[in-house]
Structure formats: structure tokens, C-alpha cells
Amino acid sequence: MSLSLLIAGALFIGFLTYYIWIWSFWIRKGVKGPRGFPFFGVILKFHDYENPGLLKLGEWTKKYGSIYGITEGVEKTLVVSNPEFVHEVFVKQFDNFYGRKTNPIQGDPNKNKRAHLVLAQGHRWKRLRTLASPTFSNKSLRKIMSTVEETVVELMRHLDEASAKGKAVDLLDYYQEFTLDIIGRIAMGQTESLMFRNPMLPKVKEIFKKGGKMPFLIAGVFPIAGTLMRQLFMKFPKFSPAFGIMNTMEKALNKRLEQRAADKKAGIEPSGEPQDFIDLFLDARANVDFIEEESTLGFAKSEVLKVDKHLTFDEIIGQLFVFLLAGYDTTALSLSYSSYLLATHPEIQKKLQEEVDRECPDPEVTFDQISKLKYMECVVKEALRMYPLASLVHNRKCMKKTNVLGVEIDEGTNVQVDTWTLHYDPKVWGDDASEFKPERWETGDELFYAKGGYLPFGMGPRICIGMRLAMMEEKLLLTHILKKYTFDTSTETEIPLKLVGSATIAPRNVMLKLTPRHSN
């Protein structure tokens, strides 16, 4: 037998042994759970667009209990729906769980020059979070309120045209146009509305569709293939919608830098405070690349952290990218679910309209007025409970071997929350957990957070940074719609909604009628 055949045989046996070792990880640990297939584990379930894997978690929870183990390609994941366990991981033991599950296409969170808030970890995450936080303060939200209001008015014009036809419309399409337009204007330097003519929308939609997930599936099973695909997409971004969008952002940043240089040469002083996210991040731009040095630092709450308030050029691209995707998809979905639930619960919709009429009597709606819409806030929170968004990112990576409530977790193991089961747990929500009941929030939400039972925006130090912006957008748009229209179901409305997706769970469509409240 030739030497080459011996080497090939040894490599094959080693390769096979490695994957069987990973696949059998939870069997050796004595932890229950679905096994799937060697090499793959259950990763194929998470890429079934028509039958979302995130909903499959609930089926497995019923079979294996509130804590069980799965493998996803080369990743080992503990799935949990025990509220106390979730709170322990996300809050109390954050020092041991400050990372997130990653995919080779995303790159190494410590070395990827375009790492963003969702991907970054350790000191780098701390720095990015510190720099981005002022963008989402109440002071900043008040400043962009007028821009959001202008976008709302533009969408209302399109909804008026749709309502006049007397037919049901897919509100998900309208809400996606709305949220992308807002992000474009407050984050990307877009100076006018591009609603229903935005060239970026097809690219963004593709990221969340079935076809956009295949590279991640391959990379999850064969990491080296993911690394090679990442290098290919970086060199040829047109082959990937995500990398194509980042390429567009790079051009927008360079254009803004050129404008700044031209203004400086002409003696034009900056207009004062940053006008959008690009300005904010460019003001914090660093002239040096310190990422490699930063990745060697330790990370713990007990350390005295001095945060260097600078961003690299590539990090700015990363932040804009994640703000675009997160701000576009989740808010559009939340609006869709809220509208559907109001249409199917007319008594709740009527109560909400009464609050809107009382608190917002004028055509123009102010920041202070929407802050007084307490029942609307209850409606949105309850919609987010019944249809949790982006729950695939409700995970943490164990960065240091530890013990959580008697369960030993090895370094490198992921902890994934079964958010859908958690949000319907009768022990947290009561026997009416399956009912749409906004009134459950009228006493506040602190108790539900404290129990570890509510994760619409995540939990702990890594909770979604943009949740206040999302709430402002949603409350403002719903106020304008409900002042003028009533959401009604039609023969085209799918009841219950048909849910699809992978990274996020989306309705296939939300076909509703907009019935005018007052005749002209």
C-alpha cells in the first residue's frame, strides 16, 4: 500500500473520529437530547425555513425537559428554558458567559476587524457598547423624533392609497419599507425617503430568506469551508448580500470622509452635534488599529476597565451593518405581530384607540405624548411575549468552565435559550399564558425580568441596545395608524399566522384591512 493511501486513510479516520467525538459529547456527559446525525447533529433543523428550528426547540423541551443538549455541526449547545438558569447565565454569571455563539463566516470575534456589538466580546464589546450607548439615550431619541415622524407621514401616504382600494394588504411589506427607511436616514446618511424604491431592500431581505442561510449551514459543519467562504465574499462581495451591504457602507463612509476633508479645506466648520450615526462614529474614529492588542486583555466585572473611546474605520462599518439589520427586521416584525393581535382582539384595539385619542389629540405627535401611552406599551410588550424576536441570538458561550445550578458547563459550550417555551411558561405567566392579555403588564415588568422569564430584547449587560429606539418607532407609527384606521381581518388573513424563518421567526404575511374610523 502506498504512503499516500496510508496518509489519506489516517486523515479520514482522524476526521471521522473528530466528528463522532463531538456528536457523542452529550451522550458521554449523560445529558438527554435529540442526537441528529454525525457531522450535522441537529443543525439542519435550524435551517428549515418553512418549519423554523426555533419552534422545534419547544417540541424537544416537552420531550427532554427544561435542560438538554444538542450538537450543531461542530458546536455543542445546552438548551434551557428554566427561568432561574437563564437569569444565572445572562446576569449573575455574566463574567463566565460574556461571549456569543459564532459562525466561521462571521470571523473570529477577537480578530475580525469589522466585529460589531452582537459578535464582539470582552474588552472590545465593552468599548463598542460604551461608544454606542449615547446614540440611544432619550436625549438622542428626541433629536431624531422629527426624522422618524417624517418617515411615518410618508408611510401613511402609502397606507392611505392602499386603504382606499378597500382590499387587505400585506402590512409586513409596508413595515419593512418603513423600518429600512428610518435606519437609512438616521444611520446611513440617507437624505430623503426611499420608500418603495430602496435599492438596498432586496439585499437585506435576502439575508433573512432561505437562500441566505446555506453558507452558514456549510460553515457550521465544516469551519474551514466557512473561513474560505468568508475570504471569498470579502474579495467578491457581490456573491453575498451581507458582504455586499458592508461594501455599500464602506463607500458611504469614504464619501462622508471626503466631504469632511473638503469642508475642512474650504474652512467650513462642523455644524455642531453629530447629524446621524455615521457622524457619531466618525467623531470617535481612531487613527490606529489596536484590535489585536485589545484581544489579549482579560475580562471580568471585578477589573477596573478604562474604555478607550475610539473606533476603527472597519468597526464603524460593522456597527452600521448590525444596526441596519437589527433595526430593519425586528421592528418590522414587532409591528406586524402587534397589528395582527389588535385585529384579532377588537376589544383591546378599541381600548388602545381610546388611549391614543385621549393622549394624542393633535395631528402632530410629540415625544412626551407617546411616553404617556402606557397601555400601548403594554400591548407591544405582550405582543413581544407571544412572538419573541431574534431568539436565535438569545445564547451565550461559556468562556470559563463553571457550574450553573448543579450543571457543569465546559469552556466553549453554548447555552441557547428556548425563548418561545419560556414566554409561555405557566409558572411565570399563569394559567392564561397562551392568551393575549396586555393588562398583565400594567403593574410593571420588573418581576418578569427578575424571574428570567422575559427576553424580547435579551437580558443582562448584553441586552439589545436599540430597544428604546424600536419602541419609539413602533409607538409613533401605531399612534398615527390607530388615530385614522382600525385593523380588521379579512378572508385573506391567516389565522393563526403561518410562521417561517431561521434567525428570526416571521409571519409568511400579515394580510389585514385598514378600515377608516371616520368618514370624510
UniProtKB/Swiss-Prot annotation:
The keyword Iron applies. Keywords: Heme, Iron, Metal-binding, Monooxygenase, Oxidoreductase. Its EC number is 1.14.-.-. Heme binds at C464. GO terms for molecular function: heme binding; iron ion binding; monooxygenase activity; oxidoreductase activity, acting on paired donors, with incorporation or reduction of molecular oxygen. Cytochromes P450 are a group of heme-thiolate monooxygenases. They oxidize a variety of structurally unrelated compounds, including steroids, fatty acids, and xenobiotics. This is Putative cytochrome P450 CYP13A4. It comes from Caenorhabditis elegans.
